[in-house]
């Protein structure tokens, strides 16, 4: 998986690799992933082919889908069709796959709002169905480069990284509040971790 990320690359999550979603689904869990999934962009790599009932999110490092907006990106539509990134995907385990449009610079401002709303709805549906659930929510905050909507900018006076962390904290609060609202907080395991999220680019990585 060291080279996962290029649009259309054959590398990605293998069918031989077990996922926690597959293990839990066999025990009656509803399984959903919302947010970043950087494990390959072909259909066979999608989370919904690896144990997840539902997936909503992007398939690359977080600024890859902005590349077609760069001024030096090839203008030939055939190039973009063959080599360009897919958009934000919404897929389900029954084989339905919807490309909801590109994760461009403007949409980057609100993508965490989108996937948080999707995660909250998933939780509602799982509880309504009286099923245990596994939810994997991967926000884009906090990652460089990031883009914030107007109302999130300047709230700390400490720059975009701190402002983004405040927005991130709000989204986490929404998820935790949903557990309380549904009356399942005392019967739910919550794990929080970062994958990287450097506050600045540092050589050599």
PLM feature segments, named:
Residues 1-205:
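Formylglycine-dependent sulfatase
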């Amino acid at each position: 998986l060291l080279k996962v990320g290029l649009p259309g690359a054959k590398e990605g999550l293998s069918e031989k690799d077990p996922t926690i979603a597959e293990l839990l689904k066999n025990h009656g869990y509803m399984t959903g992933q919302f947010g970043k999934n950087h494990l390959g962009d072909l259909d066979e790599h999608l989370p919904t082919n690896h144990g997840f009932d539902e997936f909503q999110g992007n398939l690359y490092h977080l600024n890859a889908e902005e590349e077609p907006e760069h001024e030096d990106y090839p203008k030939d539509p055939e190039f973009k069709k063959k080599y360009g990134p897919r958009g934000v995907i919404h897929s389900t385990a029954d084989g339905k796959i919807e490309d909801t449009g590109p994760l461009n610079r403007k949409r980057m401002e609100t993508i965490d709002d989108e996937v948080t709303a999707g995660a909250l709805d998933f939780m509602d549906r799982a509880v309504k169905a009286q099923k245990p659930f596994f939810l994997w929510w991967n926000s884009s905050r906090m990652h460089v480069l990031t883009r914030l909507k107007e109302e999130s900018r300047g709230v700390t006076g400490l720059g975009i990284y701190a402002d983004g962390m405040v927005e991130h904290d709000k989204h986490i609060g929404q998820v935790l509040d949903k557990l309380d609202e549904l009356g399942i907080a005392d019967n739910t395991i919550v794990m929080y971790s970062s994958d990287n999220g450097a506050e600045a680019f540092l050589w050599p990585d």
